Amino acid sequence: MTKNDIIKAAFRVWGRELYQSTSLTTLARELGVSKPAIYRHFQDKQALLNAMHETFFDEYAAFIKPWYERAVAAQDAVESLFIMMRTIVDYYARNVDAFLFSLIQVYGDPIVGARDMTAHLNRRGVDLSSLSRFEADTQTYPSMVQLILATLTFIMAHFHKHEHTLDDHPSEERIRYIIALTEKKVADGLGFNKEMVEAIDYEGLENRIAGTVHDLEEDCLLRAVAGAVAEAGPWNASMEMVARRSGLSKSSLYSHFKNKQDMLRQLFLTEFDRIVRFADLGKQHSTVPEEQLYLVIIAMADYLRSRPEILVAIDWIRTRRLDLGHIAVSSRIYQVITDIQGLGSTGEQDPSGSVSAWIPQWILFLIVNTLMRRPAGMAFSELPNSSIRVLFKFIVSGIKGCTL
């Protein structure tokens, strides 16, 4: 057994549970060895995780570097970005273990993770920031590069969730399909008319719903739950932490929640209901489909900007699987968005082949991603509406709807 054997097995074994557990005992059982046999190669679990980081970046950079050089040399801005997008989708479609590792271990912290990725790739001769030279305004946030990477991450997650188990591999036909689907979504978004999107009175729409997120009575107990989740994550947030934040005793909490799972479930169900409520209220301020969708997006963004602990809690379930029973997140958001004329019958398919129920989830994913990856040092509430407008234009018209 070599160090590389252990590293490869760790990607496979810990990835199955999305790194909820990184047990050396489980890893040793998978390899058919004792834990001391692993310790002969790695001093401790952190040393193994560090080696996994190096292996991931070595293999990832080696795969994309030839195509990165072609992208940098390309004169056409769109083609440059698409070369890299196709390459990254190709790599992650073929390497689910690497995808899961990057999603959770590298991007686990939205801001630190992005810096970590950039630094590691730079040391290996891949400077993705150089592609921003193709954008007209490199100070605009979010950048096209960020929105493209977020979109392919979302599509990859759905692809691997619906296509196959973690122990088999997608066919070449399905890999070509997912590359084409990602390219179409990035290029065209939802296919809205660019001129109509540009003609929207964004400031007027924003003023119509300004302040409405503060009209809903707060549930102080659930806010304490959200604060604990934001602080420690859903796996490590405890009833004791919630009791301390709420001023209640742990025994008193059991009169509100059956157990920790029920506590988390109530939190997420309540918050998704609130998000959908504000989205629906926002939509009612216009009868124009393009305006309605922007009102939905700005209403959801407003709510999350005003509730940072809720935003961070939702970000946890954006990247991690939680055993909370059936939470019909998509059905709630799906109805609000697909009721908008032209979105309920797009006929588009998701990576599993079903009709476009994934579009509302993609929209929420991009909203959360944009807020969580805001510029360093900026509070959630400080993210300007201009950033939400950039996000909206990308969603409805793709990069064709944004100025490069």
Feature map (PLM): residue ranges:
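C-terminal peripheral helix-coil segments that are non-catalytic and often amphipathic
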Residues: 126-133, 157-223, 227, 231-232, ...
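Amphipathic alpha-helical packing segments from all-alpha helical-bundle domains
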Residues: 110-136, 142-146, 173, 177, ...
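Alpha-helical DNA-contacting segments of helix-turn-helix folds
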Residues: 50-56, 264-271, 314
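Helix-turn-helix
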Residues: 5, 13-47, 51, 228, ...
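Amphipathic alpha-helical segments used for helix-helix packing
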Residues: 86-114, 157-161, 301-324, 369-376
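Hydrophobic alpha-helical connector segments
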Residues: 51, 66-94, 281-306
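N-terminal positioning helix adjacent to the helix-turn-helix/winged-helix DNA-binding module
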Residues: 1-2, 6-9, 144, 217-224, ...
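C-terminal functional regions that serve as terminal interaction/effector modules
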Residues: 260, 274-275, 282, 286, ...
